[in-house]
A protein has these predicted regions:
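Ferredoxin-like alpha/beta domains used as RNA- or RNAP-binding modules
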Residues: 1-108, 112, 134-209
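Short, intrinsically disordered, mixed-charge
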Residues: 107, 122-123
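Short, well-ordered loop/turn sites that connect or cap secondary structure elements
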Residues: 120-121, 140
Length: 209
């Protein structure tokens, strides 16, 4: 799985930070081999086709959030249905993806990667407004309180979390109590702050074909 994540970054030509701390270390496969995996073919001149470019953008954002094709397509299609009803469909799509519980756990620093965050959510490590939630796709809402279950805080995975969070900066729409290991949603995700690694308009074009 980890090897495949490294190949994903190399294939898409950019670091997507899919493996947490390793991505920031010299061991990062993209740093060592910043080219696509497999036999290296002679590159042809010219730009990639519109279809290939939009496909690459779609793959990049999908992999960044760690979603399956079915999951990602559903988010895009549902967002496209809101065309003309919302001010910015790109912001709408990113907002929904950012508000997934697994992504929020990652953004808060409670997990080192979205993959790890998804596993922790699935194993019911967290409470939303005092109630256990184990659905990674759960959409957090404004004023939701997100906390690690008290008896889970002693687990090895959280042993150094309080110290690690001292250096953590969270998105402006989240408020983090670094001592209590508790957070609250205080706003909405901001597209400019998220800085997605893909051109959203091309993704909409891909699924509109």
């Amino acid at each position: 799985m980890q090897y495949d994540q490294c190949k994903t970054c190399r294939r898409l030509g950019q670091k997507l930070f899919l493996k947490g701390d390793r991505c920031f270390s010299p061991k990062c496969a993209f740093v060592k081999r910043a080219f696509a995996p497999g036999p290296q073919k002679k590159r042809r001149g010219g730009s990639p086709s519109e279809y290939k470019k939009s496909l690459e953008e779609k793959q990049t954002l999908k992999k960044w959030y760690g979603l399956s094709e079915r999951q990602f397509k559903r988010y895009v299609k549902e967002t496209l249905e809101k065309m003309g009803k919302v001010q910015d469909v790109s912001a709408e799509l990113i907002g929904r993806l950012e508000k997934r519980l697994d992504n929020v756990i990652f953004r808060l620093g409670f997990a080192k990667s979205r993959v790890q965050a998804r596993q922790l959510v699935s194993h019911s490590y967290f409470l939303i407004n005092g109630k256990p939630v184990n659905i990674p796709s759960y959409q957090v809402q404004k004023d939701d309180v997100i906390a690690i279950k008290e008896h889970k805080k002693a687990k090895g995975i959280f042993k150094e979390l309080a110290n690690e969070l001292k250096r953590k900066e969270v998105p402006v729409w989240l408020s983090l109590n670094k001592e209590k290991l508790e957070a609250k949603t205080i706003g909405e995700p901001n597209l400019d702050e998220v800085k997605p690694p893909a051109e959203i308009s091309l993704i909409f074009e891909f699924y509109s074909r």
